[in-house]
Regions:
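Walker A/P-loop phosphate-binding element recognition
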Residues: 1-123, 128-141, 146-166, 173-181
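Conserved AAA+ ATPase core "coupling" helix
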Residues: 170-175, 185-189
Length: 189
């Protein structure tokens, strides 16, 4: 029964309690993916970006959250809303190696391009590493993809910076450009 003192966790569909941030379901599996994310943040370069891709419900956001929880001593990490006011991002002062995670890139490429530029400038002259991790369903770089639209939304300088700073590019293939979350196998569950 609901009273005035009961926290309302219901949304329009009654599923708010299952949102990844609630951590209602125990995180399981994805050891290899967590290790790949750890390698991403530990790489020697000062600025790198990468993406985690997979179908809706594959666990991209939960994986990123779990990674931040397990690695919080190594770097400062946070989810950054693509709709953040650019002035808020400009006020950020780097104080540690940092991982910024942006979910839902498709349709928000212009806003995210601005965020990239500001963060690149913020970290370019300091001693701290910057990692940007994008979460998106689509795993392609073809014309019209979120990747293509994001890169072309950037000013030429930042476009070159991002082209040079894509993590694991030398190991990628056309079908596996980014960290792709496939279905969990039975052993992982």
């Amino acid at each position: 029964t609901r009273t005035a003192y009961t926290k309302n966790t219901m949304d329009a569909y009654g599923l708010a309690e299952y949102h990844y941030s609630q951590q209602y379901l125990k995180f399981c599996g994805r050891r290899m993916e967590l290790a790949q994310l750890q390698n991403f943040v530990e790489a020697d370069r000062m600025f790198l970006w990468w993406a985690v891709t997979g179908q809706g419900g594959a666990g991209k956001s939960r994986l990123a959250l779990e990674f931040l929880k397990r690695s919080h001593r190594d770097f400062f990490g946070f989810f950054l809303n693509y709709a953040v006011d650019p002035e808020e991002v400009r006020r950020f002062k780097p104080f540690n190696d940092t991982v910024a995670i942006v979910d839902y890139v498709k349709g928000n490429e212009a806003e995210i391009a601005v965020i990239f530029a500001i963060l690149i400038d913020k970290f370019s002259s300091g001693p701290y590493k910057l990692r940007i991790l994008l979460l998106e369903r689509e795993n392609t770089t073809e014309f019209g993809s979120w990747h293509h639209d994001l890169i072309t939304a950037m000013a030429p300088y930042y476009r070159q910076e991002c082209n040079d700073a894509e993590y694991n590019l030398e190991l990628s293939t056309k079908n596996h450009r980014f960290l792709y979350l496939d279905d969990l196998d039975g052993a992982a569950v």
